[in-house]
Amino acid sequence: SKTTTESSTPNQGETEEEVAVQDFDIVNRTDIELEHGTITYTIRDENGKVSINSADKNTLNKLLEYSGVEDKIERSTISDSILDWIDSDKNHRLNGAEDDYYRKQSPPYFAKNGKFETIDELLKVRGVTEEILYGSKDSLDDEEKQYKGIVDHLTVYNIPTVNPNTASKEVLDILFAQEQVNEILENMSSKGFHSNTLSNYFRIKPTGKIASSRTEHTV
């Protein structure tokens, strides 16, 4: 799980950045020191998330409830609209939306009738707000509705079966019964952490920071 070279001294023709890449450690992740700053990174297993392109209505409703959508009709409207966005027909579900709804928006557009290519695309779907998707921003108003967000628990990849070893507690609670969740967590606790996993998709989020500066940039 660790891909590193024995030498930390640049060979002929190598730059400091190239050596830093060679010292990449997927398990014991630390800042990568460069000449003019540092790079930090996080790695998430996409197989430990819920696929937005294959989730059924019950799973979507649980995701929305977790984020903070308390009203059942609102949850049903969003989940039906997500399913309508993906399916190939022009017929909307009971509380869903198709072209007849989106053509009335400003500016007007069409339902995709195809799979999501990015998670941000959810913002085009009827009822989905930035707060529901990303979570509420810090607010001084205690009475303002707060949302947890679901973006970190979603993937666009086709995941036949979620990997329970890398799924978050939130994803486990959404996909499994409480008894199963307790069993999974107990097994993980007793067997310890294993650095290798047989997953197909990973998402790496790097953040660069300029030395002696508060400037950061995340890709």
Where are these regions (language model features)?
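Compositionally biased linear targeting/interaction segments
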Residues: 1-219
